[in-house]
Design a protein with these regions (language model features):
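Structural recognition of the beta-strand scaffold that forms the well-ordered cores
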Residues: 6-9, 47-52, 123-126
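Substrate-binding/active-site clefts of carbohydrate-active enzymes
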Residues: 125-139
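Well-ordered, non-membrane alpha-helical segments in soluble/globular domains
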Residues: 25-37, 103-109
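Aromatic- and acidic-residue-enriched carbohydrate-binding clefts of CAZyme catalytic domains
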Residues: 57-106, 137-139
Length: 139
């Protein structure tokens, strides 16, 4: 009998909310944290990782579309309450982890794809879009 496929679906923040799990040694967030996350998926026999790297803005490095980090600076208090279920310091720390990678010239999506391929996990991107009634018709 063929084994079941295991698909893990994660959004843009999946690897950024729990740094003590993915980078227990601390320090600026690094590509190693992304690899540690994918290692855990592989250990649990996940064979496909679908990640959504966007909301209304791209949460990945882009020169073509606006990104969540375009005007972000470390500790930017404008982001303190953006995710209301978390305390302000958690929101700021999560954004700073993205900035750590950006400053180290790490494209987290590309690095995650590399980690997936190294662990024989199929990397997929899932894209969120507004419902059709919210889109302009362009007519």
């Amino acid at each position: 009998m063929q084994e079941h496929r295991i698909i893990f679906n994660g959004d843009w923040g999946t690897m950024f909310w729990a740094p003590k799990l993915w980078q227990p040694e601390g320090g600026p967030y690094s590509a190693r944290a992304l690899h540690n996350f994918v290692d855990l998926l592989a250990e649990h026999r996940v064979d496909t990782f679908a990640i959504s790297p966007n909301t209304q803005l791209a949460w990945y490095p882009s020169k073509a579309v606006p990104t969540a980090l375009d005007e972000y600076t470390r500790g930017d208090q404008r982001w303190a309450k953006w995710f209301r279920s978390c305390p302000p310091e958690t929101n700021i720390a999560m954004m700073d982890r993205y900035l750590d990678l950006l400053e180290a010239d790490v494209d987290w999506m590309a690095e995650t794809v590399l980690a997936c391929k190294q662990r024989q996990i199929a990397p997929w991107a899932s894209v969120r879009a507004p419902p059709p009634e919210k889109c302009a018709t362009g007519a």
